[in-house]
């Protein structure tokens, strides 16, 4: 009997030791995952523009939400900056993946776009040269992206996209459309890719909205439905403060049925094209 009790006690100690070891490994994994999330979040904060450029008659606002309630920091980002010719550039993009590598690559893409824009401000050329740089870096990740240039002197908006979801354009005069012009392949796949640009003159007040696919597409939500929802929302609220409009648009992501990260960039303008033509001051 004493021998059996000793065996039982030994077995219990072994089980407790194994349980302790398992608990320790689980805690180590939790700490490692937490560190990864914190690192990715820090990289994300460095990439997301803390303050978007504002010009007379033009305001911009952005929104970003991470995946899985903040547990996955993905590769979605937006950016805005003044360019050497006096125009302003805006970009939004989505790097493949939801991890530290995606967040780090997102920073590289943003840096490439800004660097290229010091040499040329044409959106087609900006995307083309950035694509060639990323291909030369030989990363396994690809990037969808839209880049646009707004000229405050003329009111012209020129944009190009690389495998990215369309933008939405609405005016206070009642016009609203999903901008379905031709685009090129995502960045980082093939060198020498061509990215067609579209141009429009912003002659009246309205809003131009850029977004990532996490806002409009998911397992339970076809992208066409998502784009229509955003278009209806922007058409009804294009006069709204851009920060409020961005907050409304990002909520469409709640309908998608998944937990992808999502980003929105809203440009609200006051008819600078008309102002430029009439010479008003």
Describe every region a protein language model picked out.
Residues 1-33:
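Short, low-complexity N-terminal regulatory "tails/caps" that precede and couple sensory modules
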Residues 20, 110-118, 216, 231-238:
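Short amphipathic alpha-helical signal-transduction/dimerization elements
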Residues 15, 203-204, 210, 215-281:
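C-terminal catalytic subdomain
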Residues 8-12, 41-44, 130, 215:
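Short acidic/polar alpha-helix capping motifs at helix-coil junctions
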Residues 3-11, 122, 240-241, 278:
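Intrinsic-disorder/low-complexity, polar/charged segments
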Residues 24-207, 256-281:
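… and, occasionally, acidic/histidine-rich disordered N-termini of signaling adaptors
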């Amino acid at each position: 009997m004493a021998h059996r009790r000793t065996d039982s006690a030994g077995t219990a100690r072994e089980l407790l030791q194994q349980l302790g070891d398992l608990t320790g490994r689980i805690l180590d994994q939790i700490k490692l995952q937490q560190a990864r999330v914190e690192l990715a979040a820090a990289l994300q904060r460095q990439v997301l523009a803390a303050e978007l450029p504002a010009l007379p008659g033009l305001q911009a606002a952005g929104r970003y939400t991470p995946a899985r309630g903040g547990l996955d920091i993905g590769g979605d980002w937006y950016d805005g900056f003044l360019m050497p010719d006096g125009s302003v550039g805006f970009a939004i993009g989505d790097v493949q993946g939801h991890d530290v590598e995606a967040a780090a690559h997102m920073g590289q893409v943003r840096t490439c776009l800004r660097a290229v824009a010091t040499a040329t401000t044409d959106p087609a050329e900006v995307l083309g040269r950035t694509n060639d740089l990323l291909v030369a870096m030989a990363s396994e990740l690809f990037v969808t992206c839209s880049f646009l240039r707004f000229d405050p002197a003329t009111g012209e908006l020129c944009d190009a996209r690389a495998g990215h979801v369309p933008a939405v354009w609405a005016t206070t005069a009642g016009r609203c459309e999903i901008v379905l012009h031709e685009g090129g392949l995502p960045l980082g796949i093939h060198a020498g890719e061509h990215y067609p640009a579209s141009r429009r003159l912003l002659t009246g007040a309205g809003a131009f909205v850029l977004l990532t696919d996490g806002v409009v597409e998911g397992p339970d939500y076809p992208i066409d439905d998502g784009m229509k929802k955003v278009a209806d929302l922007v058409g009804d609220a294009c006069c709204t403060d851009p920060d409020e409009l961005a907050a409304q648009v990002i909520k469409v992501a709640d309908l998608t049925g998944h937990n992808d990260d999502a980003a929105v960039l809203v440009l609200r303008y006051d008819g600078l094209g008309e102002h430029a033509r009439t010479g008003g001051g």
